[in-house]
Amino acid sequence: MMTLNFATQVRQMKAIAGQPDYALGSVHAVTREGTLFIASASGSQLASYAWGAANVIFVVGAQKLVPTRDAARERIFQHSLKLEDARALVAYGQHSSIGKILEIDREQPGRTHIVLIQQTVGF
């Protein structure tokens, strides 16, 4: 993908990025029932998580476990966004925002794997 020109080949870049064999990432919250919540400013990573990738692996810190969907949304807006906003301001000189939130309730058997760790990872 690095050899493609963003100005003239953005469609090809999106096609490649949206259909990888594997997607590795994290989530912002996991409910007691197992619903995964992933927030994004642009949504660029969400397509592969939701459908495009053949296999998805999420590494999730135990601090992201919450009891309910409402608690997951509250965690995203009151915790994750605040930390990401501060990081983006230093890194890019601009504020962050949440443009999209993906909720995953059910998945094809064997497609998505969660690695739950005790270490604090991400926001």
List each model region and its residues.
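N-terminal active-site beta-alpha-beta segment that forms phosphate/nucleotide-binding
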Residues: 1-27
